[in-house]
Structure formats: structure tokens, C-alpha cells
């Protein structure tokens, strides 16, 4: 989408019934030029027909591309003792960073589609059933024959803080650029795309290059190890939500003060991002965007239920808020509240 087309789209979002003459007057261009731009927007699928109905207004859905897996979580009854058996509670659920973000957004009321890879096993079927029960469209699933579905194992202390985790996400490597090209119409029609860095670098690069210029792409680094995939490769992404350690890796600097945090976020913005949201655990959230706005959403003391899921719920609230067109002053408190539910 060209810059002029973006300007026209913004005017039509505000008033879909604007005439070509009025659009031309507001932008200071000729009416015939407006007609050409509108025709191009129609060919690209951004405008559906009379009244300049925007495709994004027909169904403002989110597409998630990334991990959906079985979560095995253990939580000790007392402080953890390393190298010993700890009495506790063990549960199984469907998880995965992108899945969790999508489920949270879906439960908030957003239309959501998920593109992921699962094995042809009972776990894969469980993932599909639970996604559908949450209101997530699973037509984009790739079922890898002979492979096991992804499994994530985490161990938490008696306060709910994660001590260590292990993951087996090999099936996710079966997602390919060719497979995603077959989902082009779904991706092209999205209002926002969500990805996580558990994806192969080739997939992350393809989504950023093919869709990032027109569709906001939200990316979660997932971990310090996976965050390295984004270092120096942020162009094409709209929003990144790192924690403090991941932000240090992305910005290639140590962060020990508020001033250094602002500097690090600024470095990431300079690489092409529209906004950076750094989660700081109990300290809250720091937000910075391309327009120069810098905001803090302070944390409040609370009992942590699951530190792993809280960040995913926050991202779900962030993407949902984007669909609603909310300003950051409303988005951040909403997303923080979502992370505490």
C-alpha cells in the first residue's frame, strides 16, 4: 500500500461515504487521481464496493501464526528444592505463545484465525478441539503425519513464579513459506497478524516482508534465545513486546535505569517499529511509539497465578485494543488488567 493509499484509507475509516471530490479536496490532489487510487485499493482487496466499504470493516479479524501446543505445568506446594522430588500439582492444558494470545483475544470477543502445525496424534486433536471451543478458526492448521504435537513443560515455585521450562516444538518447523502462500487470502484479509519467535527465521522474515507494509504484525520474542532471531531484523513488524532481558538483546545494550530503557526502546523504533511495549514484571509496563509518546503502566502487588500466561494475556489485550482503535492511554491499562485475570 502506497502512502497516498494509506491517507485515503484513513479518511474512509473516518467516513466511508466521502465523495471522490471531497477526498481530493482534503488531500490536495485531483479527483481523477483519487479515482485511480480507489481502483487500486479495490484490486488489492482493501475496498469491497459501493460506499467504499473497507474489507477490514467487514470482519476485523486477527490471524495468529505460531505455536499451539500441550502445556504440562507443575507447581510446588512449598519452596522448590533443586535436585529432589517436590510435592506439588501437575496439570495439562493447551498452550503455546501464539495460541494463548489468540485465545485471550477470542475470549474478549475478537474474531481470530490460527495458522499452526500439529502432529497427527491425540494431542493435536485436543489442540484443535479446544481452539474451536474458544472460538478460534482452525481451518489453517497443518497436520504433520507421523509427527508429535508440540509439548511445553514448565516448573513453577509455590508463588507461581517459573523456575525452569523445556519445550519440544519440532513440528512447528514443518510450517513453510509455501504453506503460508496458500493462506495468502486469509493473511491478506487480517486486521492484525500475531507471530512468535518460535517460528523459523524464514517464516518470520517472510511475514514481515510480505505483509508488514500493509498489515500490522505483532511479534512476541518468547525468550532470550528466540529473541536473537529479531536482532537487527525488526523492519516490517509493527509492535514488539519483549521483557527486560529480551529488550536488552534486541537493543544490544544493558538496561539498568529508566533512561536506558527509553533509549533502548528508541533504538528499536529506529529500526522500523511503530511501537514497543516492554513488560517489567511487578514494575508494570513501559510503552514508546514512533510519535514520541512514552507511557508507564505501573504494576500492582498481586498473587501470581501463572507468570507464563500473564504475558500472553497482556499481548492478547494489546492486539484486541488495537482492533478497537483505542489510544495507548486506554490500551495499556486494559492489557494490564487482562494479564491479571
Model-predicted segments: where are they?
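Conserved beta-alpha-beta core of the PfkB/ribokinase-like small-molecule kinase fold
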Residues: 192-263, 283-285
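Active-site nucleophile and cofactor-binding loops and adjacent substrate-binding regions
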Residues: 89-97, 142-146, 308
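Short, conserved phosphate/pyrophosphate- and ester-handling motifs at nucleotide-, phospho-/glycolipid
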Residues: 105, 243, 311
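Conserved phosphate-binding/catalytic region of the ribokinase-like
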Residues: 1-20, 26-27, 32, 36-56, ...
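Glycine-rich phosphate/adenosyl-contacting loop at the front of the ribokinase-like
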Residues: 4, 10-13, 18-22, 26, ...
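Conserved N-terminal subdomain of the carbohydrate kinase-like
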Residues: 58-59, 80-88, 107-191, 213
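Short gly/ser/thr-rich secondary-structure transition/capping motifs
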Residues: 45-49, 173-178, 219-225
Amino acid at each position: 500500500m502506497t502512502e497516498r493509499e494509506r491517507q485515503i484509507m484513513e479518511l474512509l475509516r473516518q467516513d466511508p461515504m466521502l465523495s471522490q471530490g471531497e477526498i481530493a479536496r482534503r488531500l490536495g490532489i485531483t479527483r481523477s487521481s483519487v479515482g485511480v487510487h480507489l481502483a487500486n485499493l479495490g484490486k488489492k482487496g482493501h475496498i469491497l464496493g459501493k460506499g467504499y466499504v473497507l474489507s477490514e470493516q467487514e470482519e476485523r479479524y486477527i490471524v495468529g501464526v505460531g505455536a499451539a501446543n500441550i502445556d504440562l505445568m507443575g507447581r510446588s506446594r512449598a519452596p522448590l528444592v533443586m535436585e529432589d522430588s517436590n510435592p506439588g500439582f501437575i496439570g495439562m492444558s493447551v498452550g503455546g505463545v501464539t495460541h494463548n494470545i489468540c485465545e485471550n483475544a477470542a475470549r474478549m470477543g475478537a474474531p481470530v484465525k490460527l495458522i499452526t502445525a500439529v502432529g497427527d496424534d491425540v494431542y493435536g486433536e485436543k489442540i484443535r478441539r479446544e481452539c474451536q471451543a474458544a472460538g478460534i478458526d482452525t481451518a489453517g492448521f497443518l497436520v504433520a503425519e507421523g509427527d508429535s504435537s508440540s509439548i511445553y513443560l514448565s516448573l513453577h515455585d509455590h508463588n507461581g513464579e517459573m523456575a525452569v521450562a523445556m519445550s519440544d516444538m519440532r513440528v512447528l518447523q514443518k510450517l513453510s513459506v509455501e504453506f503460508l502462500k496458500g493462506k495468502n487470502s486469509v493473511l491478506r484479509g487480517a486486521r492484525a497478524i500475531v507471530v512468535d519467535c518460535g517460528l523459523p527465521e524464514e517464516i518470520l522474515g517472510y511475514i514481515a516482508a510480505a505483509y508488514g507494509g500493509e498489515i500490522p504484525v505483532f511479534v512476541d520474542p518468547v525468550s532470550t534465545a528466540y529473541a536473537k532471531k529479531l536482532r537487527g531484523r525488526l523492519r516490517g513488524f509493527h509492535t514488539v513486546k519483549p521483557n527486560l532481558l529480551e529488550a536488552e538483546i534486541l537493543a544490544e545494550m544493558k538496561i539498568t535505569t529508566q533512561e536506558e530503557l527509553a533509549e533502548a526502546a528508541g533504538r528499536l523504533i529506529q529500526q522500523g517499529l511503530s511501537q514497543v511495549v516492554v513488560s517489567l514484571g511487578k514494575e508494570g509496563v513501559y510503552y514508546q511509539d514512533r510519535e514520541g509518546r512514552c507511557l508507564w503502566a505501573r504494576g500492582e502487588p498481586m498473587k501470581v497465578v501463572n507468570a507464563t500466561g500473564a504475558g500472553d494475556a497482556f499481548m492478547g489485550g494489546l492486539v484486541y485494543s488495537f482492533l478497537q482503535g483505542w489510544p495507548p492511554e486506554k490500551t495499556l491499562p486494559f492489557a494490564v488488567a487482562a494479564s491479571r485475570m
